[in-house]
Amino acid sequence: MTCWLHMLGLHLLLLPTAPLAAGCPARCECSASTRTVACGRRRLTAIPEGIPAETRMLELSRNRIRCLNPGDLASLPTLEELDLNHNVIAHVEPGAFANLPRLRVLRLRGNQLKLIPPGVFTHLDSLTLLDLSENKLVILLDFSFQDLRSLQRLEVGDNDLVFISRRAFAGLLGLAELTLERCNLTSLSPESLGHLRGLGALRLRHLAIAALEDQNFQKLPGLSHLEIDNWPLLEEVAPGSLRGLNLTSLSITHTNITAVPAAALRQQAHLTCLNLSHNPISMVPRGSFRDLVRLRELHLAGALLAVIEPQAFVGLRQIRLLNLSDNLLSTLEENTFHSVNTLETLRVDGNPLACDCRLLWIVQRRKTLNFDGRLPACATPAEVRGDALHNLPDSVLFEYFVCRKPKIRERRLQHVTATEGDDVRFLCRAEGEPAPTVAWVTPQHHSVTAASRGRARVLPGGTLTIADTRPQDSGTYTCVASNAGGNDTYFATLTVQPAANRTQGDGHNETQVGVRFPLDLTTILVSTAMGCITFLGVVLFCFLLLFVWSRGRGQHKNNFSVEYSFRKVDGPAAAAGQGGARKFNMKMI
């Protein structure tokens, strides 16, 4: 008996004495120190009774609760966090969250909610986080969140959303983060987003939206972080799609864009982090990021990058991290950068790198550059295939990392005379180590490369082809072969003569005769002499006619007399002059 009493006393001493634990509901675990009640995975179908009034955190996740009714939580005025994730809640009645003035976190992820009735979140003035993801929401009605003035983070991803009304986000003056993912939205309403003046981060993931319109984000002046991920229908980022934003972080990943959105990026001078990974981008043209003077991180991993043109990263004066891993790059030249002195972390692993002089700048910095634990390795030449750049001995540098300047073979002068409409070719075969790239410069000082599209193109071997030649194509063409070791040039000339007969492109056959008159000194002198002789002949012919006509009139009297009598004038002077009539003798020639 004494032994039994002793064991009973010991058992009583071991019982919890905390006041919160004394009022703990059945099938729940309570903690007095943190004022937490944990009732997760208990197969509960309703809010349990007997929850201590001083509870701060209530965890009811992964149960079978179907509905929240008014008054279910009214006895918990000090509640700060409520977790109702992964139940089967289909209805939340207005007033269900009444008398919860201190509630800061409300989690309703993974339920069966299809609609949020007006007034459900009334009086939740302290709520800062609301998670409604993984439900069955189809539409967000006007003023669904108007009473949540303190809300900072809203999660509504993984729903069946097809429409967000214009005033759905009205009242969310303090919202800082919004996530929309795995919805059926096909467009973004600038009017609905325009109510989120204080929004700082917007995450848009797994959406079937095909285009970013110019006005999508114009009313979000405070947005600093924009994430666009898994938009398989997005093929282009319009130049004005980011207008009005002052982003510091931009991520556009797992889309179908095939080019760097350089025009849209020019307006983002405050950008410090840019992620364009996992897009089918095959080339980075020259100057693609020239206006991003504050950029510190650039990610282009897992794309289809095969070519990065010289000066592609010009303007990136503060670049610290560059991630080009898992692409198709054979090299990365130093002249690609504005300056490599600021670079701290470089990821070029997962590329078929050719270990030659173009990578010498990386090898020389292999002890100070951070490769983030992913060491790049050589794919060629065969002697060092699979060797990590970081582990190459210095003796290898003089054997494999040496360039040979390009040299153009067959330097015989090419002069081609073609008729308008003909196709012509100019050869330019160059050799060097590494293999040089060939470009041509036209008489109009335009550069023609292998990537050019038009009548003039450069074939893989360096040959220039000009289709459908025209007279304005005439002139001197310059071939420029270049690699990391230098360049070599070669000249060719083309003369295009106009065609005599030309078929117009409108479907009507018209014959145009083009006659060329070569103008030289002999032609001018002969033409002048012929003109003078013709003029003099005409003059002589006229004199001859006059002579013959005058002879045909017969003999004429050449002399004749004219008698003239002065008129009488009164006065003395007149009297003295009276002497009769005077005669004049004249001869006609």
From Swiss-Prot:
It comes from the Eukaryota. It is a single-pass type I membrane protein. Keywords: Disulfide bond, Glycoprotein, Immunoglobulin domain, Leucine-rich repeat, Membrane, Repeat, Signal, Transmembrane, Transmembrane helix. Residues 24-53 form the LRRNT domain. LRR repeats lie at residues 54-75, 78-99, 102-123, 126-147, 150-171, 174-195, 206-227, 246-267, 270-291, 294-315, 318-339. The gene is Lingo3. Residues 1-23 form the signal peptide. This is Leucine-rich repeat and immunoglobulin-like domain-containing nogo receptor-interacting protein 3.
